[in-house]
């Protein structure tokens, strides 16, 4: 069976608490069943109280953290041109990087491309 979870705020918690993504007290549960696939959207939540510079900084810190944790945990962070068919045919655990609050763009249109290059596939405004 394939599982697709569209939203998980654990990334924000792990980054701000400087903890591991698979901390047992968090919501993340890795798929250990070789016959199923799990695609998780990891959302970095950016509080409205942050100014644009702070939100942008937290975004880039979170992007580095997610990449590192995906490598450590064997999660395939899907990039440009990779979609759910790849996730469900090739990888047991895969991820999309998402952003909850467009303030992370910090008013810089060039950040749209930069975010996409870092794997962002969904962003709320």
Give the ranges of each region predicted by the language model.
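N-terminal hydrophobic targeting/anchoring segments and the immediately downstream early-domain regions
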Residues: 1-125
């Amino acid at each position: 069976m394939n599982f697709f979870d569209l939203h998980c705020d654990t990334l924000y918690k792990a980054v701000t608490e400087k903890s591991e993504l698979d901390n047992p007290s968090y919501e993340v549960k890795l798929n250990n069943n070789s016959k199923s696939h799990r695609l998780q959207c990891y959302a970095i939540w950016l509080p409205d109280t942050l100014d644009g510079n702070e939100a942008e900084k937290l975004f880039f810190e979170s992007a580095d953290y997610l990449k590192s944790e995906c490598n450590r945990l064997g999660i395939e962070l899907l990039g440009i041109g990779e979609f759910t068919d790849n996730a469900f045919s090739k990888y047991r655990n895969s991820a999309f990087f998402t952003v909850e609050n467009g303030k992370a763009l910090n008013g810089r249109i060039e950040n749209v491309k930069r975010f996409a290059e870092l794997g962002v596939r969904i962003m709320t405004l």
